[in-house]
Structures are given as C-alpha cells and as structure tokens.
A protein has these predicted regions:
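Bacterial N-terminal signal peptides that target proteins for export
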Residues: 1-10
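Core hydrophobic alpha-helical transmembrane segments of single-pass membrane proteins
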Residues: 12-15
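C-terminal motif of bacterial Sec signal peptides marking the signal peptidase cleavage site
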Residues: 19-22
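A short, solvent-exposed, low-complexity linear motif enriched for acidic/polar residues
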Residues: 24-273
C-alpha cells in the first residue's frame, strides 16, 4: 500500500512539473511589432535648389527595395568598418517593394513599407536593404527612377534619370531627433531607410565648401543633354554623354544615397546578372 502511495505521489509531481513547463512556454515570450519605413525627406516631397542654382521639384522618385532586415547587434554595428552585420537577432521583411518617395505632401510621414508582428523585444540598432532592379511596375528594369522638373533662368527641363545599378546598404543605428527600433512588449516600434538626394544634386542653402556640395554632381551637367526641354537618361547613356569626372561623381554619390536618418551606411554595389 505504501509503495502505491509513493508511486502515485511521484506521478502527481511529474504531471505538475509538465503543466508548469507548458504554461511557462505558452505565453512567456515578450514580443511586439516592428515597422519598416522609407523616407526621401523634405528634399523630395517639397523640392529644393541644387548647388548650382536649379530649382528641382519631383513628381516621382521610385526606389525598388528587397532583402530588408533589422538586426539587434552587440556591440553596435559600425558601417565605417565592414559590410557584415554580426547580429544576435534578425527580423526580415518578406517581399519586394517599389516605393514612391515623392508621395504625399510637405508634412507627410515617412512611407510605411511593411511590418512584422511578434518580433522579440529589444533594440534593433542596425538595418540593411538592397536597392535592386524592379521586374515590373513604374521602375521596371531599374533600381531607382527620378522624375521631375528643373528650372533656372527661364529654362525648364522635364527629366527622368534612371539607375540600373544595384546597391546593398548596411546601416547602423538611426541618428535623429528620436531613437528608433526599440521594441517593447505589446508595442510597435519602427526603423527607417532614409535617402539623401541632396548628395546627388547638392544644396544651394548650405555653403559651397560643405561636403554635401563638394561631393555632389549638381544639375548643371545634365542640362546640356536635354532636347526641347526633355531629358531621359540612364546610367549607361550618361556614361557616354557626361564627362568622365562628372560620371564618376554621380556614381560615387549613388553609393552614399542610403542612410538611417543622419546615420551612415556601408554600400556594396551588387553585380549585374
């Protein structure tokens, strides 16, 4: 009889242990939602004046984004050192997205590309993405298509500049007025892919010797390529028509297009298939 009681007691203890383990694993993990935004900033939504005095307004700025990821890294990832993000946790946004950065008015929020739910809490302090050729849609065959109008001294040029090269941007923590990527239990956080188009055209409102202007091509080199106020070029045609120096400047600026706020990114140009 005593032996039976002992066996039953052991069985009850085991059942209780299994029950406790089951309850702990079912709802104990803290999770939240992580959103991915793309932002061309006010330069794209409002227009601006290039370093060489052209007033530029954008109708559409299409970027095609794939392989989008946010990572938790410790120590923090440094894009000035390597392209490799050594992460503890990685959250990928599935799919491919063509985003119009010029969409919305002056006060428009950054564009929501997508979100991932039930991600582990923590600080996602690194972001990476690829700017790849779109297979269809308004950016078909290109990774970036810039459409707008440039005006100076009574001359007006409707332009389309298309980029067929592909780039991978690996970025550290967002730098701006607020920190991003901090996911808390039950809450929503966001990370941002930022694009600095003043790096291409420069900015008349900052000094000529500012790094933004010294590294930018401006718009003046494009103007002579217009025919009856119309300009439509891609990188291949621009390589043939621009001076070697201007073309190399353009190529360099495209590699610096991707940011996280004011935070920098490491850029790899992707091989063409």
């Amino acid at each position: 009889m005593g032996r039976r009681v002992i066996i039953l007691a052991i069985m009850a203890l085991l059942i209780g242990t299994v029950t406790l383990i089951g309850c702990g694993g079912g709802g104990g993990e803290a999770v939240g939602t992580l959103q991915f935004h793309a932002n061309g900033e006010d330069f794209v939504r409002e227009g601006f004046v290039s370093k060489d005095g052209w007033s530029i307004n954008f109708d559409h700025v299409y970027v095609h984004l794939e392989d989008i990821n946010a990572c938790r890294t410790d120590p923090p990832y440094d894009p000035h050192v390597t392209a490799i993000i050594d992460s503890d946790v990685e959250v990928g946004l599935p799919g491919a997205y063509t985003v119009d950065l010029a969409e919305g008015g002056e006060d428009a929020d950054p564009i929501l590309v997508g979100e991932v739910q039930n991600v582990a809490v923590g600080h996602y302090n690194a972001v990476s993405w690829q700017m790849e050729q779109a297979s269809s849609g308004p950016a078909a065959s290109y990774s970036l298509v810039i459409i707008g109008t440039a005006e100076k001294d009574g001359e007006s040029i409707d332009f389309t500049i298309s980029v067929e090269e592909e780039y991978r941007y690996s970025c550290g923590e967002y730098v701006g007025d607020e920190r991003k990527g901090i996911v808390e239990d039950g809450d929503t956080a966001d990370v941002e892919m930022t694009f600095h188009f003043d790096h291409i055209f420069g900015d008349f409102d900052v000094p000529p010797d500012d790094h933004v202007n010294t590294g930018a091509i401006g718009f003046e080199p494009f103007a002579p390529l217009a025919d009856n106020g119309q300009l439509s070029e891609n990188l291949a045609s621009l390589e043939a028509k621009l001076s070697a120096e201007d073309y190399q400047t353009l190529v360099r600026t495209l590699a610096t297009l991707g940011h996280v706020g004011e935070g920098h990114c490491y850029c790899d140009k992707q091989p063409q298939s």
